[in-house]
Amino acid sequence: MNMRIEPSVLANPDLQFATLSSGISLPYVERGSGAPMVFVHGSLCDYRYWDPQLASLSAHYRCIAPSLSHYWPAVEAGIQDEFSWQNHVDELAEFIDALDLGPVHLVGHSRGGSVAFNVARQHPHLVESLTLADPGGPLQQPGVREAALPATALALRTKAVNLIDQGEVEAGLEMFVDSVSQPGAWKKSTSRFRTMAIDNASTLPKQLRDPLPAYSQHTAGDIACRTLLIDGQRSPKMFRNNVDTLSQWIGNAQRQTVAGASHGMNAASPAVFNRFVHEFVAA
C-alpha cells in the first residue's frame, strides 16, 4: 500500500507497522515489556499524544500506542475505508489480534475513549481492563428518544470545521481545542501539541460527519472488565457528566479526578495520571 511518510518519521526507533487482515498498515510505537497496555488517542491526535505515558508506564508494561487510520503519520493508510468510529473499533480489534496481544489493558482518551469502550463491548475477550479518560460522545438518558451533542457544541464544531475547510486551519483548531478544554487552551498548549493537531487537521471535518454513538445504561452494562474512569477537575461539563454517569452504569467501576487539570489531563499532569492508571491496573 502506498503511504507517503517523511523519512524523518521513519527514523524513530520505536516506530513499527502492523499489517491488519483488512489490508490496513497501522503505524504504532512500542516501549517496555510486561503485560500489554494499548493507548487509543482522540481527536486531532496520534501516537505522539501518549509520549508522557510511554515514558513512565513502560517501566512496568509493554506500552503500545497506534495511530488510527486517517491520522498522522500515515494519512493514506486507511484510504480504502471511510473514517468512522466503527471502523476504528474494528481495526483496533484487528490490531490487537495481529500483534497477538490480547487480552490487553486498554486506555482511551476523548474520542479514543469511545473507541476503547466499544472495543470492550464488541470484543470482550481482547480487553483485560479498561481506562476511559474524559470519554467522548453523548449520553442516552432514560426517557429521551435520541441522544446527541448539545446544540451549542455542535454549532461551534461546525464553525471550527468550516474555518479549516476555508484554509484558516489554526483558527479552526483553536476554536475546537478551546471548546473541548477551556478558553485559551490552544494558545497555552505546547508547540509539540499544536504541530500534532495541525498534522491531523484534515480528520476534523471527517469526524463531524461521523457522530460518536451514545452511551446508555444498556451499552454500559455490556462492559464486563474492570474499568477506571478519569476526568479532569476543570474538564468541560459534558466530559465530567460522562464520567459521573458511566461510573454508576458500569459495574464496579472506579473513578479518579486529576486536580487542576482540564481535558488534556494526561499531558498536563502526567505523574498523577500515570499513577492512577498504574495503581488501578496493578491492583
Where is each model-derived feature located?
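Conserved HGGG/HGGXW glycine-rich cap/lid loop of the alpha/beta-hydrolase fold
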Residues: 17-81, 95
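Conserved acidic catalytic loop of the alpha/beta-hydrolase fold
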Residues: 86-104
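Short beta-strand immediately N-terminal to the catalytic nucleophile in serine-hydrolase-like folds
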Residues: 106-108, 133
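Gly/Ala-rich beta-loop-alpha elbow adjacent to hydrolase catalytic centers
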Residues: 108, 112, 116
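Flexible "cap/lid" loop of the alpha/beta hydrolase fold
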Residues: 117-122, 126-164
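Conserved alpha/beta-hydrolase catalytic His-Asp/Glu region
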Residues: 165-205
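Conserved loop-alpha-helix segment in the C-terminal half of the alpha/beta-hydrolase fold
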Residues: 217-264
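Catalytic active-site module of serine/aspartate enzymes centered on a nucleophile-bearing elbow/loop
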Residues: 251-283
